[in-house]
């Protein structure tokens, strides 16, 4: 998967770098607000968050926002089209406590990526897709 990771705080930048290094089976690109990214050596989210999000929506398989869900939702809203074509979108708080599969969970791979990010960070994975949480996509054994 081609993954873009966006961070908005100093602590978010630390997670950004850790995740880019740890998710080795993927191709990760880290980005940050200029004032924090500059000191961490992470490219800036530029020229603006909306323009960056539009570009990432077109070229990446997944986007992970390290920050408030509100930032993620407002950033992706203009570009959401279809669960069949939209990239996976995740959101993780800057303390690394929770990672949320926000968009394209099942088809786009956000649920699986959420589990991978949680394994790296120790975060609680938050997955709300009905088939994932109720196991309705599995054939469960029945008692004889």
Predicted regions span which residues?
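Short coil/turn connectors at secondary-structure junctions
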Residues: 1-2, 26, 58-62, 84-88, ...
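N-terminal basic/disordered segments at the start of proteins
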Residues: 1-35
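Flexible, glycine/proline-enriched loop segments at strand-loop-helix junctions
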Residues: 5-6, 61-63, 97-107, 138
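General beta-strand structural signal in soluble alpha/beta enzymes
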Residues: 29-33, 64-67, 91-92, 125-129
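N-terminal beta-loop-helix "entrance" segment that forms/cooperates
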Residues: 30-54
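Short Gly/Thr/Asp-enriched flexible loops that form oxyanion-binding sites at enzyme active sites
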Residues: 74-85
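Long, charge-dense
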Residues: 88-134
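Conserved small/polar residues in nucleotide/adenosyl-binding loops
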Residues: 136-142
């Amino acid at each position: 998967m081609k993954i873009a990771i966006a961070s908005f705080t100093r602590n978010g930048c630390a997670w950004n770098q850790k995740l880019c290094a740890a998710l080795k089976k993927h191709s990760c690109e880290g980005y940050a607000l200029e004032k924090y990214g500059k000191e961490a050596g992470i490219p800036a989210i530029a020229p603006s968050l909306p323009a960056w999000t539009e570009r990432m929506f077109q070229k990446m398989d997944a986007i992970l926002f390290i920050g408030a869900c509100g930032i993620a939702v407002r950033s992706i809203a203009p570009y959401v089209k279809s669960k069949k074509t939209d990239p996976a979108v995740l959101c993780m708080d800057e303390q690394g406590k929770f990672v949320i599969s926000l968009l394209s969970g099942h088809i786009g791979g956000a649920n699986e990526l959420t589990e991978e990010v949680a394994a790296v960070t120790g975060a609680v994975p938050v997955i709300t897709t009905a088939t994932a949480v109720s196991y309705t996509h599995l054939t469960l054994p029945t008692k004889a």
